[in-house]
UniProtKB/Swiss-Prot annotation:
Source superkingdom: Bacteria
Single GO biological process annotation from the record: cytoplasmic translation
Coiled-coil portions: none
Protein's name in the database: Large ribosomal subunit protein uL6
Family (UniProt): Belongs to the universal ribosomal protein uL6 family.
Gene: rplF
Keywords assigned by UniProt, alphabetized: Ribonucleoprotein, Ribosomal protein, RNA-binding, rRNA-binding
GO MF assignments: rRNA binding; structural constituent of ribosome
Length: 184
């Protein structure tokens, strides 16, 4: 079994957890999340702890147990991220590097000048908040870790860092290894 799934997930105060029909639901101070899970997994909810275990009722062969154990660690991490999301939330920061490269919010759209002939406009999803504290910095935040990461990756994809000059959109703290240019 996944070693991480041996530990229980601690439910903090102010968080409600429900398991109904293979759907794990979490409600907390920042919002509500739900995640469907496979029937191979059995979830035991005690007073303030959650245990993720393989469901042995579905085991027909010995090889099935390996598949069930494989999913326990994945779902343990997904459920733990949901609990962290509804209590603390997640955020990703991006920085824009390059002369004339900048971003701004216009209503529900993120408008970026990234060296193309036209400004790039991107709709902001309703479940994610995007802030632009300065023209060369973008902050993506929300309660769903997967969603926050995907929106940040979509923004970064518009102009990934150039390996020769380093210009583009990168995560704060990301190290871009620069290649050496041609020698004359």
């Amino acid at each position: 079994m996944s070693r991480i799934a041996n530990k229980p997930i601690v439910i903090p105060n102010g968080v409600e957890v429900k398991v109904e029909n293979n759907v794990f639901k979490v409600k907390g101070p920042k919002g509500e999340l739900s995640q469907e899970f496979l029937p191979y997994i059995k979830i035991e909810v005690n007073e303030n702890e959650i245990y993720v275990k393989p469901n042995l009722e579905f085991m027909k062969r010995k090889s099935d147990l390996k598949k069930m154990k494989m999913f326990t660690g994945t779902y343990w991490r997904l459920f733990n991220n949901m609990i962290i999301g509804v209590t603390q939330g997640f955020r990703k920061e991006l920085e824009i590097i390059g002369i004339g490269y900048r971003a701004q919010l216009q209503g529900k759209k993120l408008v970026m000048n990234l060296g193309y002939a036209h400004p790039v406009e991107m709709e902001i999803p309703s479940d994610v908040a995007v802030e632009v504290p300065s023209p060369n910095r973008i902050v993506v935040s929300g309660i769903d870790k997967q969603r926050v990461g995907q929106v940040a990756a979509d923004i970064r994809r518009w102009r990934e860092p150039n390996v020769y000059s380093g210009k583009g959109i990168r995560y704060v703290g990301e190290v871009v290894r620069l290649k050496e240019g041609k020698k004359a």
